Every structure is written in structure tokens, then in C-alpha cells.
Amino acid sequence: QFWWAGDAEQVSTYWYAYHSRWIPLELFEGAHARQLAATLFEASRRWTVGLHFNKAQAGASADAVERGRRTAMNPAVFRAAALAIIAAGGDGAPGVPGHEPDAAEARAARDRVDAAARIVREATPGAGSYVNETDYFEPNWQSEFWGENYARLLQIKRIYDPHNMFTCHHCVGSEGVIPARAVSASGRAR
């Protein structure tokens, strides 16, 4: 088996929507904790909100934080106690007759996931998102995925890859690489 058994239901899932948000440690403490609980409850009325405490770095050893700060990771991770993930997907194999995703179901799930994510995002300004588990259509991806590291990373990119040979969607330096026709005015893929 090539994956953790606990994640088996995710294998070959066709994702309709996917959001993540670093949840700062301070929101779990003192007077903030009650507001965080209310926020998560309100968001959960729209869609399931999963909290992953194994991905954040608040409370990590000073050595681990120092080593981590030398990476591309959004520095928000070092202030976070958890990563909230709000996602929806289902069976489907686009392009395989008889196995197409249910488009109406996908749109409805996407709208509910987006609504839940908006609530969490509004309660965590500047907290950022985990680049590997996030909204493909994030409009503020430079700050959300890379935080204050973006300017430094872009300088490095321009030195070692001035012609943008190595790129991907929402990677450092990818501005303008994705054709405009691939994304609608609403920010959704066409």
C-alpha cells in the first residue's frame, strides 16, 4: 500500500473545492478561544472544518523554527497551532464515460465550502494558507502562500531562473504565466 490507510478515501478523489488556513496559537488562548469556537461552529454550519494540529509549528523548538525560517514556507506557520482544512470532493474521472462528476453537486459543494472558508478567513486576517493544500483560485496567492518571504523568493527566482523555465500555477514568479482565458472573471476555471 502506498498511502496511509486513514486517508484511503482521498485516493483518486475529484476535488470540487479546497481551502486551508493557518490558525494562530493566540486564537486558542484566553478570551480569543471563545470567539474561535464560535467562528468554527458558524463555519461548520456551511461545511465540515478539519483542524490539523500536526502541520503547524507554534511551540516547536527554537532550533526547528530557525531551520524552518530558512525555507520558503510562509512564516505564518510558526505562529500557527493548527491548519484548518475545508474541502469537498467526490468520485469521478473526468473524461471517462460513465464516471463524470455530478456538476450540480460539485457546484453546490464548492459554494458551501467557499462560504465556510470565508468565515474562517475573516476571523484570521493575515494568517495565510498552506500552499500544498489550498484554493487553486486564490487571488492573493503571493501573500497567502508565501507571506513575507515572497519578495526574497522572487529575487532568488530571478537570479537562478531569469527566463521562468521552471514554473507552475501560483509558484513564485508565475505571475502572467497562466493564460488569462483559463480563468473566468469570477476567478473560476472555465
Where do the protein language model's features map onto the residues?
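Soluble FAD-dependent oxygen oxidases
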Residues: Q1-R190
